[in-house]
């Protein structure tokens, strides 16, 4: 995870590392 941390949490297009 943590592929794209720049992606907004609203758009889950990429793996967001929470």
UniProtKB/Swiss-Prot annotation:
Source organism superkingdom: Eukaryota
Residues carrying covalently attached carbohydrate according to the record: 4
Tissue-level expression: Highly expressed in the placenta between day 60 and day 100 of gestation.
GO term, biological process aspect, one: proteolysis
UniProt subcellular location: Secreted, Extracellular space
Keyword Transmembrane: no
Entry GO MF terms: aspartic-type endopeptidase activity
EC number: 3.4.23.-
GO cellular component, one term: extracellular region
Keywords: Aspartyl protease, Glycoprotein, Hydrolase, Protease, Secreted
Signal peptide (from-to): none
Other comment: On the 2D-gel the determined pI of this protein is: 4.0, its MW determined on 1D-gel is: 61 kDa.
Protein family: Belongs to the peptidase A1 family.
This protein's name: Pregnancy-associated glycoprotein 61b
């Amino acid at each position: 995870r943590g592929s794209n941390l720049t992606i907004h949490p609203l758009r889950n297009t990429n793996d967001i590392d929470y």
